Amino acid sequence: MEHTFIMIKPDGVQRGLVGEIIGRFEKKGFSLKGLKLLTVDQAFAEKHYADLSAKPFFNGLVEYIISGPVVAMVWEGKNVVTTGRKIIGATNPAESAPGTIRGDFAIDIGRNVIHGSDAVESAKKEIALWFPEGVANWSSSLHPWIYE
């Protein structure tokens, strides 16, 4: 099964959207494998967003991520990276469809509530960074009702 990294950003935590977001992934049929509520320091945020370090918005993004607690999660499921991105919606909330997390809960790109891995390889890298101790090894009893 595929894994993805999902992070509820400080605005999502402050606005009380954690349960709603987890519920959307669970209702889809994905399995939660790892979960942490934490605050990160600047060095860690810079490492997470290293691929964006040359972008003009990089410093603001780092400040935003360290401004409050985040919820870091690992989800498992068939095509979870691609499907997770569809659940989240476009990076720019103005381009996100209603029914997506960003389409329903975000207005500005700089406060877009949630991060999700954009590819299987980036998911592996992000999971290794955020969950160096690994994740829970369990299988949902619902798998036969979700997967062929």
From Swiss-Prot:
Looking up NCBIfam families in the UniProt record yields: PRK00668.1
| Record family assignment | Belongs to the NDK family.
Matching entries from SMART domains are given as: NDK
Enzyme class at the top of the EC tree: transferase
Query: Which InterPro entries does the protein's record reference?
Result: NDK-like_dom, NDK-like_dom_sf, Nucleoside_diP_kinase, Nucleoside_diP_kinase_AS
Q: Where is the active site?
A: 115 (pros-phosphohistidine intermediate)
Keyword terms, alphabetized: ATP-binding, Kinase, Magnesium, Metal-binding, Nucleotide metabolism, Nucleotide-binding, Phosphoprotein, Transferase
Query: What's this protein's name?
Result: Nucleoside diphosphate kinase B
| Origin species | Flaveria bidentis
Instruction: Determine if Metal-binding is one of this entry's keywords.
Output: yes
Entry EC number(s): 2.7.4.6
Q: Which residues bind ATP?
A: 9, 57, 85, 91, 102, 112
**CDD domains, per the entry:** NDPk_I
Cite the source lineage: Eukaryota, Viridiplantae, Streptophyta, Embryophyta, Tracheophyta
> So which cofactors does this thing need?
Mg(2+)
Per its database record, what is this protein's job? Major role in the synthesis of nucleoside triphosphates other than ATP. The ATP gamma phosphate is transferred to the NDP beta phosphate via a ping-pong mechanism, using a phosphorylated active-site intermediate.
- PANTHER family (alphabetical): NUCLEOSIDE DIPHOSPHATE KINASE
Q: What GO MF terms are annotated?
A: ATP binding; metal ion binding; nucleoside diphosphate kinase activity
Q: Which GO terms describe its biological process?
A: CTP biosynthetic process; GTP biosynthetic process; UTP biosynthetic process
Q: Describe the reaction catalysed, as an equation.
A: a 2'-deoxyribonucleoside 5'-diphosphate + ATP = a 2'-deoxyribonucleoside 5'-triphosphate + ADP; a ribonucleoside 5'-diphosphate + ATP = a ribonucleoside 5'-triphosphate + ADP
